[in-house]
Amino acid sequence: STVQTINREEHLKQFSKDYFDYIIIDETHRAGAKTYQRILDHFSPKFILGMTATPERTDGYDIFSLFNHNIAYEIRLQKAMKEDLLCPFHYFGVTDIKVNGEVLESASDFNHLVSEERINKIDEKIKFYGTDDNTLRGLIFCSKVDECKAISEALNKIGYKTRALSGDDSEEERANAINDIESDDPNKKIDYIITVNIFNEGIDIPRLNQVIMVRPTQSAIIFVQQLGRGLRKAERKEYLTVIDFIGNYQNNYLIPIALYGDTSYNKDTIRKLMASGSSLIPGSSTINFDKISKARIFESIDSSNLKLKKDLVQDYQLLKFKTGRIPSMVDFLDYGSRDPSLYVEYSKSYYNFVADQEEEYESKLNPSQSKLLEFFSMHINDGMRVEESIILERLIQQGFISYDDVKAIIRKNYGYEANDKTILSAVNGLNLKFVTEREGGNGKTLSINEKYGLRIVSESENKITIDSMLKDALTSTIFTKFLKDNTEYALKTFGNKFSADKFQDGFILYQKYSRKDVFRILNWEQNPNPQTVGGYFRSKDESNIAIFINYHKEEDISASTDYKDSFIDNTTFTWMTKSNRTLEAPEVRVIREYNGLRIPLFIKKSNAEGKDFYYMGEMEPITNSFRQKNMSSGDPVVQIDFNLNKPVEESLYNYITHDN
């Protein structure tokens, strides 16, 4: 019996509430509809089971509550592929046609979407990429019903057998089309079903061996649904071919999110996934992009705002439904949901965001407590350095911790030796003496500690204790709850990215750091003014010079700052000092002497990536490489070559050095 049939009043009356011991709901994400609700309200079974590939509804209905938030088993696309439950796929992201020199956009004119040029390109790619057995059994997904019909007519004219289907077609017509695409009878068989979204779910076409997408990706969930139509295993089916025509679409960043299954919406993570190619895809499946389509996706990642309030609220609500409670920052990590740091970036603290969503938390903290949570969230518990969070966790638990205990915890959990200088720097950070703010209108820069007169922790004789302001704040159970969660989030975040073989005295190779992060990890007493840092800055004690590189500079950059900084190869880097420097300049002298000097290298591909830089490793100057040069402006500059202490990993090296 179908849902539509049993939903009728005359049919429901035939069954008592306890007639069924077990009820199984397939495609249970639809259970929020009135038809399903009427059935579920009528029956009281001993056991109810829901099955769906996409439980994350975006209409605000809590599907999980129907099952008391009890998730018996969950398997996502990547895990199903790893377990060999699906057939492999080969994905090809190809550039859509250009109209008047411009790649198609979401709002492109209908005539361009069905132009002869576009039909010819679809035909070309069908023949080029083909299928596993050279027999076409494909689905083509379009963005509009009239586009489906026009593309179907055009492909039929050049020799294909296709059928356009929409919501107006009956179940019988859809079933006939499925039978025909699976048929071996040459008189019945069709090559393609062309549709918008009616085949996103609930259909079974095991022999389907090609999926073509000629529409922008509006949702990672829908992308996976459409991809999944062809992943069913079948006898003699070797793989699925996926051809995705990528235009200049705003949401192109959703493609790697869908393909790789990462829903953190962390831009750096998405870039790394794109750079990884097929290496992170289970089994024999592959992912390929042509040069232009790959550039379009990177541009979309750079330009998209991944912390819009509507998106943050949506993912917050989905996780709340899933867990059956207000989610914590750690829940976002444990469930593989949106990166909780995005909530901090948006609201200054996760508490602020929750208080905006939940009446029970509104105005529960006084301004001092709320401000302190903001400071910890933005400047301490960010997962960039672990020492502060270890100290804070123990202070919350017992009010004190010794230097030796900090060292023992780090030795046990991470296998490296912390030193007194770093622990003292962490205490300085916890007291918010490192981070600065401007005071009033005079522009004077003060540490946050000095500006607000904070007393957070005390340090004496290698013992750290809780001070008055933090002690008072911890009398609030809500403050304590959110600070504990924030601290646990920081410890987990650091632990998730920590790798002993990539850890180099505070930094983790190929992780991203802001300038503020860098100077904090280098144990500077106070964060320097960014305007004075520029491309590098040396410490007062001349123990380190951190170098920051914007690898692909803007075309309109001034001649006096157009520095020729670049990789010679993956182990050698050539670098220029600031202009108006000679071989006798102080920083050149310090680098030439290289007496215990630390020179960490930080690079971002371009300014479009934002303010953070990849840590590329430690550098050592090549003795005979110091040379006096002149900028194109005529200003003197010194160029120096360096050896990196480790070769840069291939995927990141290629990503940074290749211009989009």
Language model features with spans:
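Conserved interdomain linker/interface between the two RecA-like ATPase lobes of SF2 helicase motors
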Residues: 71-142
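Conserved helicase ATPase core of P-loop NTP-dependent helicases/translocases
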Residues: 11, 149-150, 160-199
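Post-DEXD/H (motif II) to motif III coupling segment of the RecA-like Helicase ATP-binding lobe
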Residues: 30-90
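Conserved helix/coil segment N-terminal to the catalytic DExD/H
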Residues: 1-22, 33-38
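A short beta-strand element within the Helicase C-terminal
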Residues: 192-216, 222-225, 229, 240-244
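Acidic, glycine-rich low-complexity segments with interspersed aromatic residues
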Residues: 371-378, 384-395, 506-612
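Long, largely alpha-helical accessory region at the distal end of helicase-like NTP-driven motors
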Residues: 127, 144, 258-391, 398-402, ...
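Conserved segment of the helicase C-terminal RecA-like domain
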Residues: 220-225, 229-260
